[in-house]
A protein has these predicted regions:
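Long C-terminal interaction/binding lobes of large macromolecular proteins
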Residues: 113-145
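Iron-sulfur cluster-binding cysteine motifs and their immediate structural context
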Residues: 1-21, 31-48
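A broad, structural surface signal
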Residues: 2, 79-89, 101, 113-117
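Extended, compositionally biased low-complexity polar/Lys-Gly-rich tracts
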Residues: 12-15, 19, 49-60, 107-108, ...
Length: 145
């Protein structure tokens, strides 16, 4: 419980000397597994991934990436990445400086729904996967920049 609180998201707390996990806070980091003194917590043989999208750095328009999928399997993530390359090839601004454009700008221009349509083409998510219906980017917004 202490390792989760100090090193991660404080998803664990004790009730009657028993660790209880808050699944809404758990990010699957494994600190509980590594630090459990009794070995009661174990990692599943299955691997799951979190896919955060469209974060970018820079002075003009930085923005934090936001979760698109959580608890997705590896096969789904690979298919989504391949599909994302196809999406970029279709929608990249050929007149962008150096022929390069950050994918975040492409998604801004085409809309999240269009990106989602391309990214999920032919992808069957497991029952455990959670997909965000909308993504609202946070971060600093500079006026007139």
């Amino acid at each position: 419980v202490r390792a989760c609180t100090k090193k991660s998201t404080a998803a664990l707390h004790a009730e009657n000397y028993t660790p209880v996990r808050d699944h809404s806070k758990c990010i699957g980091c494994g600190e509980c597994v590594i630090n459990c003194p009794t070995g009661a917590w174990t990692r599943s043989k299955e691997k799951y991934y979190r896919l955060a999208i469209m974060g970018r750095t820079g002075k003009k328009n930085p923005r934090l990436a936001e979760d698109f999928l959580i608890w997705a399997d590896e096969e789904s993530i690979i298919k989504i990445i391949v599909n994302t390359y196809k999406y970029v090839e279709q929608y990249i601004d050929k007149n962008a400086p150096g022929g390069k454009e950050h994918i975040g700008y492409i998604v801004d221009r085409t809309g999240f729904e269009e990106f989602k349509k391309w990214a999920l083409e032919g992808v069957e998510l497991s029952d455990k996967a959670i997909m965000m219906n909308n993504v609202y980017w946070s971060g600093i917004k500079y006026p007139n920049v």
